[in-house]
């Protein structure tokens, strides 16, 4: 996520979503009553009555602002849509007061105007912006004995390499080929270890080397292997990196990792609930009472609860007392389990019963 402009006086923020996670965050930042503006495309028909044959109209792109009524995000298609009444736009093209659905698209500017930006909503927005500034992933493309690295950053791809193994043909003894291949793999590992805080490594390529290197990581560097996923490409080098980007693999894997982390947090709560019920609380009243006592070490909050319930002060209270707040999406099984518990659950630092 990138903020383009911020007009605090008028409650306007213009931003550019860059990942599927950004769209997910925006699905809970954009609320009913917001004025949402973006470029949109509509088919405009000739209403002059002069045409005899049916007129399918002409597609035109223009800036449109709607007063939001509903917001929907479909996690599997990655589509974020907001529906509402048109308040701003070219009056010769669209009737004011009619309904329209805006689709929020990646890498396309979007303006959100609110009567009041809550502290927690702004904090969530800043978190998304900070996350996008970090190194998102490394794409490692391997073809034969040549490897190329693509560091995926907010502004684009930063290339590193090539790393060359100089592994000769099969006429050389297998023992020597194995030694040279290990040296090649070690040089790649050395490059990867420079980015220790990285969460995602996509190992790609057209041939056998990518899976062989992954097996090598599993055996010798399991801490790196657990961050890695495999992807097929038709070619190596920078063209292979571009192919991975076109497939949307980085966005898909990043989203899957966020979901996996959320599910782990819900499972941690459920395990404690089964093993020692007094070490956790759930339900709105019980959780808020525990927060007031300073007993909540980790608070799990369903995304729908954040947008619908007046709990911002309680979220701030947990963090001010050294606890953590974890937002859980309602789009996966972990979120549905949390929803069945009332949408709020806390892991306690001390028992209150």
UniProtKB/Swiss-Prot annotation:
This protein's record includes keyword Cytoplasm: yes
Pfam families documented for this protein: eRF1_1, eRF1_2, eRF1_3
Gene Ontology biological process terms from the UniProt entry: nonfunctional rRNA decay; nuclear-transcribed mRNA catabolic process, no-go decay; nuclear-transcribed mRNA catabolic process, non-stop decay; ribosome disassembly; RNA surveillance
MF-aspect GO terms: endonuclease activity; metal ion binding
EC code(s) of this entry: 3.1.-.-
Lineage top rank: taxon: Archaea
Keyword vocabulary terms for this entry: Cytoplasm, Endonuclease, Hydrolase, Metal-binding, Nuclease
Gene3D superfamilies for this protein: 3.30.1330.30, eRF1 domain 2 (3.30.420.60), Pelota, domain A (2.30.30.870)
Location(s) in or outside the cell: Cytoplasm
GO cellular component: cytoplasm
Required cofactor names: a divalent metal cation
HAMAP family xref list: PelO
UniProt subunit comment: Monomer.
Functional note: May function in recognizing stalled ribosomes, interact with stem-loop structures in stalled mRNA molecules, and effect endonucleolytic cleavage of the mRNA. May play a role in the release non-functional ribosomes and degradation of damaged mRNAs. Has endoribonuclease activity.
Similarity comment text for this entry: Belongs to the eukaryotic release factor 1 family. Pelota subfamily.
Name assigned to this protein: Protein pelota homolog
């Amino acid at each position: 996520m990138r903020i383009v402009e911020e007009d605090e006086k008028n409650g306007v923020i213009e931003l550019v979503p860059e990942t599927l996670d950004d769209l997910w965050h925006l699905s809970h930042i954009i609320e009913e009553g917001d004025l949402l503006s973006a470029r949109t495309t509509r088919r405009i028909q000739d209403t002059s009555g002069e045409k005899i044959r049916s007129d399918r109209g002409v597609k035109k792109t223009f800036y449109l602002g709607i007063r939001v009524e509903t917001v929907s995000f479909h996690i599997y298609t990655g589509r974020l849509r907001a529906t509402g009444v048109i308040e701003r736009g070219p009056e010769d093209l669209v009737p004011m007061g009619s309904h329209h659905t805006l689709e929020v698209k990646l890498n396309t500017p979007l303006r959100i105007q609110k009567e009041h930006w809550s502290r927690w909503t702004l904090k969530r927005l800043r978190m998304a912006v900070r996350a996008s500034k970090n190194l998102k992933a490394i794409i490692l493309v391997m073809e034969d004995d040549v490897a190329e690295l693509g560091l995926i950053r907010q502004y684009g791809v930063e290339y590193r390499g090539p790393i060359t193994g100089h592994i000769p043909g099969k006429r050389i003894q297998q023992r020597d080929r194995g030694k040279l291949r290990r040296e090649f793999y070690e040089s790649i590992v050395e490059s990867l270890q420079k980015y220790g805080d990285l969460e995602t490594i996509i190992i790609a390529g057209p041939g056998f080397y990518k899976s062989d290197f992954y097996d090598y990581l599993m055996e010798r560097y399991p801490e790196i292997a657990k961050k890695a996923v495999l992807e097929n490409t038709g070619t190596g080098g920078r063209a292979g990196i571009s192919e991975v980007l076109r497939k949307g693999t980085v966005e898909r894997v990043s989203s899957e990792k966020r979901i996996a982390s959320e599910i782990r947090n819900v499972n941690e709560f459920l395990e404690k609930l089964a093993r020692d019920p007094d070490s956790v609380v759930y339900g709105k009243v019980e959780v808020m009472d525990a927060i007031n006592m300073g007993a909540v070490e980790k608070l799990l909050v369903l995304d729908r609860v954040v947008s619908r319930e007046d709990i911002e002060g309680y979220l701030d209270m947990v963090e001010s007392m050294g606890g953590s707040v974890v937002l859980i999406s309602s789009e996966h099984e972990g979120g549905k389990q949390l929803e069945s518990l009332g949408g709020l659950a806390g892991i306690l630092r001390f028992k209150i019963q």
